[in-house]
A protein has these predicted regions:
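Single conserved hydrophobic/aromatic residue that forms the stacking wall/gate
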Residues: 1-12, 265, 269-271
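N-terminal beta-alpha lobe that positions the nucleotide/phosphoryl donor
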Residues: 9-233, 242
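A broadly conserved detector of short glycine/acidic/proline-rich loop/turn motifs that flank catalytic sites
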Residues: 89-91, 99, 236-238, 256-257, ...
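ATP-dependent carboxylate/acyl-activation modules
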Residues: 132, 201, 242-248, 252-270
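Glycine-rich, charged/polar anion/phosphate-binding loops
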Residues: 218-220, 233-237, 246-252
């Protein structure tokens, strides 16, 4: 595990993966980057061999989370000012959509209540909670997406809603409760309420996704070696669904289609 600020993308993309190395470089040159850290590809390769975290890795993750708390002024799992993070894969070679991501880690029944107090926006909070419940259950607990998708579609149809934006705070709260019930039925246990356990299980899931069939098939097609491994990027959450004045997206500094035609290397000049 290596914090972004200590590294440069010129020398460490094999260790930090493409995302981690670029975040490190952006931090180095002073671009505002949400606080976080990267678990190296070496840790992934070790986990693939032994099915266990490398010795000392988890202690380093705990220390890095403490530093992230210090930088943000928030506390992971805190009932007053909770820190929420994402857990994303990031290999040296881009493999779009082939590996796993979990967002909004750190939410539970306690931190949801504190987030509502902090934001005064219960609709937003229950929306991001249902996203965690669905995504974590699918990626980490390996519960089929259909259980969550079908329930939401049926509920929206019963209410006469055409799009998700018509859902109210009470609607999303109901969906959260139903999603937690699905977890009990399909997984046999309650959804993990401990944020530290959430991030540990999400990290394992990202490591496992490197050797998943979808990722292996993609690497075979693109001639990417299995030995690269994937890094894991733990980053403070930035929300694109907070309200009408928030959004997320991708920005290119040049036309990606025309650039691709003159050489792949030049595609790397992008935001």
């Amino acid at each position: 595990e290596i914090t972004w600020r200590d590294w440069s993308s010129d020398v460490c993309s094999s260790d930090l993966g493409g995302k981690g190395a670029n975040l490190a470089e952006m931090t180095r040159i002073g671009v505002p980057v949400p606080a976080g850290f990267t678990i190296t590809t070496e840790a992934c390769n070790e986990y693939s061999k032994t099915k266990e975290f490398p010795a000392g890795m988890w202690d380093q993750v705990v220390a890095a989370m403490a530093e992230t708390e210090k930088q943000t002024g928030k506390k992971f799992g805190d009932s007053e000012n909770p820190l929420l993070v994402s857990c994303r894969s990031g290999a040296k070679e881009s493999m779009p959509g082939m590996m796993d991501t979990v967002l909004n880690i750190g939410l539970n029944d306690v931190t949801v209540a504190s987030m509502i107090k902090l934001t005064n926006n219960p609709r937003f909070v229950y929306d991001i909670y249902r996203r965690l419940l669905h995504m974590f259950s699918s990626v980490v607990l390996e519960i089929a997406d259909e259980h969550f998708e079908n329930l939401l579609l049926q509920y929206e149809a019963e209410k006469g809603y055409k799009v998700d934006t018509e859902m109210t705070a009470e609607d999303w709260k109901f969906i959260c409760d139903e999603y937690k019930h699905i977890v009990i039925l399909q997984y046999g246990k309650e959804f993990p309420q401990d944020p530290v356990e959430q991030i540990r299980l999400a990290t394992i899931a990202v490591f496992k996704s490197w050797m998943g069939k979808r990722a292996i098939d993609y690497r075979r097609a693109e001639n990417i070696p299995d030995s690269l491994g994937t890094a894991v990027n733990i980053c403070t959450m930035v929300f694109g669904n907070y309200g009408d004045d928030s959004a997320t997206g991708v920005a290119f500094t040049r036309d990606p289609i025309k650039t691709w035609q003159i050489g792949r290397a030049s595609c790397r000049e992008r935001v």
